[in-house]
């Protein structure tokens, strides 16, 4: 699995954030892929591949 860390952070648009408990990322530039495992863990998957690239934020539950 390839890890893809993003140097740019979008406040309020993290994967599994309070506004998107099902793992949706709207208007954040990462697509809107359904990632149920992203909620509560602070990580999600991009729209290119469900298991191709994992983006991790230690403060995703902001």
UniProtKB/Swiss-Prot annotation:
It comes from the Eukaryota. The keyword Chaperone does not apply. GO terms for cellular component: cytosol; intermediate filament. Wool. Residues 12-53 are annotated as: 12 X 2 AA repeats of G-[YCGS]. InterPro entries: KRTAP8-1, KRTAP_type8/19/20/21/22. Pfam families: KRTAP (PF11759). Keywords: Keratin, Repeat. The keyword Signal does not apply. Interacts with wool keratins. In the wool cortex, wool keratin intermediate filaments are embedded in an interfilamentous matrix, consisting of hair keratin-associated proteins (KRTAP), which are essential for the formation of a rigid and resistant wool shaft through their extensive disulfide bond cross-linking with abundant cysteine residues of wool keratins. The matrix proteins include the high-sulfur and high-glycine-tyrosine keratins. Belongs to the KRTAP type 8 family. This is Keratin-associated protein 8-1. It comes from Ovis aries (Sheep).
